[in-house]
Amino acid sequence: MGRFSRSWDLVEQSFAILWADKQLMFFPVLSGISCVIVTLLLGVSGLAIFLPAIRAAGITAQNFPHFAKSPEFAGAMFVFYLANYFVIVFFNVALVGVANSRLTGGNWTFDQGLQLAWTRKWVILQWAFVAATVGMVLRALSERAGFIGRMVIGIIGVAWNIACYFVVPVLAFEDVSPGAALYRSAELFTETWGERVVGGFSLGLVFFVLMIPGFALWFAAVRLWGAAGAVAGGVVMGAYMLLLSVMSSAVQGIFNAALYRYACDKEVPAGFSRDLIQGAWAPKD
């Protein structure tokens, strides 16, 4: 089975669970809205704090890149990363909690998912601090490195993402610290699929293909109705893309919960095929 075919089947199986429990889509919606609100609040606060200093220092668009390397700007960006990481992980924990309930025959409600995330809020905040720190460090190193250095940092980033793959469900279901969650996540992954692996699926690729009809609709509207079609088609395409984004986030959360259950219990959750779950990651030749 090819990588795209495998990915398509995984999306279908995950979507079947989403279709049976549509409340799962509310978590990505709330996550997105919360991130927008947090970004706006931080942006307004940042302007209020830094604008007088920016004016006093005579910072313009031409010399802003120099200001962007200052400790003050780095601190502001860290707060931005921290806040958004917290929001994203918080709602992902809630999503994985409800998805896990569905996979194991339970019937958790939306509120129960939020309650789970709320009980984990402090460890989620601690993990957000760790993730924001690593993200900032990798970003800073990448900006200062040459071509080879960026390749090495990219490899480190991939290894970090794999090690973190099960951090969200571990935070949700196991009473551990952020460091222990990272260790447990990496342990589950390597014990189940090995240390050197390649992805046997790409949910992002499937949703990229699903985006094509949205662009096609917009181009068709422009060709048929000109400027009016561009506006109307843009509205429809935007709504379609938002729906795909919500569905993509929900499907990824469901699949993450399914793989976590398999990694813990070595039993394939109901609704998923054994071959697809076992082959989600393959040993690297």
Residues covered by each model-derived region:
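Hydrophobic alpha-helical membrane segments
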Residues: 1-285
